[in-house]
Amino acid sequence: MVTYNEHLKNILTQILDSYHILRDIQDKPGDLDNIKKEMLKINGFLKVATNNIDEYKISHSDFKKLKSKFSHYLENYFFEKEIETMAPLYSKDTHRVKNMRFKIIEALEDKKMIEDMGDLMEKI
């Protein structure tokens, strides 16, 4: 049976994997679909961590702070509509694709959310 800590670690690993894929995208025409896919995966895992993981069952108190950062991200950053609007017009414009990718990365790094995820993973 998977413990809460292991479950949380698996979720954080998948978020960080998608984050690293976003960072490594080369901003070629057609990459907007890849950006959208990774962003949706991140959002889904953040929702799972926020809604389904009980911070009182995690042995490290750092998760409570991180969970509030997840909620902040989900409440304040919404890129799906922008990507849907942008895709038909600018999906081949590498500068706009790059800018969208940077905005998503910047949002993920807001309040040191990504950094804190890595720190918590090391402690679990």
Feature annotation, model-predicted:
Residues 21-36, 54-60, 86-96:
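Charged, low-complexity interaction regions
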Residues 72-124:
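Amphipathic alpha-helical binding modules
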Residues 45-70:
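Short, solvent-exposed, charged loop/turn and helix-capping segments
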Residues 15-23, 43-53, 77-87, 115-118:
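Extended amphipathic alpha-helical scaffold segments
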Residues 1-6, 63, 67, 71, ...:
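A contiguous, well-structured "functional interface" segment within a domain
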Residues 1-45:
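Short terminal alpha-helical segments
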Residues 2, 7, 16-19, 60-62, ...:
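Helix-centric, low-specificity signal for extended rod-like, repetitive segments
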